Each structure stands twice: as C-alpha cells, then as structure tokens.
Design a protein with these regions (language model features):
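Metallocofactor- and cofactor-centric catalytic cores in central/energy metabolism, strongly enriched
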Residues: 2-134, 138-143, 148-150, 154-155
Length: 155
C-alpha cells in the first residue's frame, strides 16, 4: 500500500507555546517569536472558567466569544510570525472560532499582511443540550482532538 503522507525531513519540528490560559502574559508571544527558531507557535487559552467568561461575552455580543487578548497579540506579532515563517496554532477562537478568523483576516488586511487563516469548529454542543440531557448550560463543548488542526495546517 502506498502512503499519501508527504515525506518529512529528519529535522525536528520546533514548537513553542505562548499561552497556558486566557490572561497569560501578553508579552509571551513576542518573546517566543524572538527567542529562537520555531516552526509552530501554539497558544492554549481555554479552560472551564474561560468558557464561562467567553459565554458571558457572547451573551453581550454574539460576535464575541473568543479570546480578545489573542487578537491584540496578533496585532503586535503577526508580521513577525510571517517574516519568520512560524505557523500559529491556537484555540483562542473559543466559542466563536469563525468570528476570530474573520477578525484575524480583517486585522491582516489592516496591517497589509498576506496571511492564511483557518479555523476548526464543530465542538459547540449547546444546541444539543436537551438531547444530551445537559439542561440549559451557558456553554457545552466537546474535545475534538487534532484531526481538524492537521487539516487546517494542510490547507
């Protein structure tokens, strides 16, 4: 059987992380981008408390529901990441990954930066809360794993 997976070089993939929670150090993204060679920079913004915060944001404004600090970090660091060839992977989209993707594309346009933006969705189960016996939660989300992220990186 022939593999359709492209051959990978023997060079290790260099991955850095700039966030462990929503509200982590704002400067961490720039520090990671300037601190050494990277292929990917990740950011984890989500936890149960964060989902509550994002849910309350979304109640006030349906266009929200994502980690706003990530957007500010990208305003500061998107050009640097592009210049260095670093691909950014984050779950900062929270309850509204499409909304964050739109905001990122608008930001890139405003900055005059040609950037590819992809997002993964499908984890929002709030519309199925009754069916799943969850009552009336503010948020209900599933962990999707890495397949969507891989597809986004491959696109």
């Amino acid at each position: 059987m022939t593999s359709t997976t492209p051959a990978r070089s023997d060079r290790p993939v260099r991955i850095g992380n700039a966030s462990g929670f929503y509200g982590d150090r704002f400067s961490a993204m720039r520090e990671m981008l300037e601190g050494g060679e990277l292929d990917y920079l990740t950011g984890d913004y989500l936890a149960e408390l964060t989902m509550l915060i994002l849910g309350r944001d979304r109640l006030k404004d349906p266009a929200l529901g994502y980690a706003k600090t990530f957007l500010r970090q990208m305003e500061d660091c998107l050009g640097l990441a592009i210049d260095k060839g670093v691909r950014i992977v984050s779950n900062a989209g929270g309850l509204n990954p499409h909304g964050l993707a739109v905001a990122l594309r608008e930001l890139a346009d405003k900055l005059g930066i040609d950037a590819s933006v992809a997002f993964v969705d499908g984890d929002d189960l709030v519309d199925r809360a009754d069916e799943l016996g969850l009552g009336t939660p503010l948020t209900a989300n599933a962990y999707l794993g890495a397949f969507g992220i891989k597809s986004a990186l491959d696109s």
